[in-house]
């Protein structure tokens, strides 16, 4: 135990370790309680037997070489430890006289936060969310009844005598008490582990019921505080929201396929109902407006969209706070994701490049795209394509050229395909672009123009098919086929030709190239 070694070395000038023993009857108490009592309160080392189980032995550290070999010192320390272990055994016995469900009733007397109600209120929200996660198939192979039961009992140990004395054991003791009363192992494990992971590098639970309860608990905390206007700032994070976000991302970025927007809305619904005094009364319009405002836009915080400020709910909740929280959530999670992925060697600018596409809130899919992009962009071919993209983007920016899609938006020209009943509006716009400029190239195209147009015609459907199949390596390969044609285009073609039809066609070709690249990622966000 390195921590106890350092502490004892600092407390003594001439450290002498002495072995002592305590009554075996105390081993009935959970080993973590004995370890905590010995280590934290007494600065003792605990010992294990040959089987690796906790032994009824301890090592204390004296500051002198006693004439009796330390017998008196050991006896004195044994008595002190025995008194503490006696208290612990008393707590253990008293707590087990009630079921966790009976203990949980005491949560109604504990305030979680003035804006978020009692711990009992939080437990109710978490239980419903955990059940929803299972019933919607987001967390698979879990029993919804067990998930809800575990969530309703997860905080019950907060009112027990043992956790009152040893707060560090919250969750852990709940698991022991659950087993002691014969609850299913899946429920006991979920109660024990639902606080995990508590930070980077911590163990991430994999048991389905535990995942449902842990994810629901962390989501409820983050969403609640953000909607209540309580944000982490700088080095201050009094409610450990960054740590909770790491826990959420450990599930949603590594294993669970789920829309973050869907998660946000589901977790926010009970909070919004609470803030707006239940949706059935005057707050209903605000409730619905806030719920529909959730989206996965990491730039939403910078847009400062107007929100209704004329409503003040209970406990100081206002629309200003609610809508500010909604706008800040995507950026908060995006920043946490960058920090989390930095240790895995993933570049933050590539995460930005994929986030900038908008609407990609399945983090498992997003990271798969980012990693494929990083593999490609770090090759010589990828660097060349990035350089070609930036040159094209700079020309288009200088000319304020947005392609046909932008022309329609600026001029308001009626789109002849606007009435086409096609759910894929991008397909409509692409058809419009093709129809509008089909006759513009009424001049002899230079070979490099033909080559780039032909490469785009081949790369666009290949990339679209690969993206639809989530084969991001194949999508990068499709982009790679554009590298040589775009280089040749810049070497052989004068974009800003004097003839307007040539200039327009060539700028449209570059806009088409930029759009093809943007289907994979926004290369303007990539450094280099």
Segment roles from a protein language model:
Residues 1-528:
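Amphipathic alpha-helical "coupling" segments that flank catalytic cores
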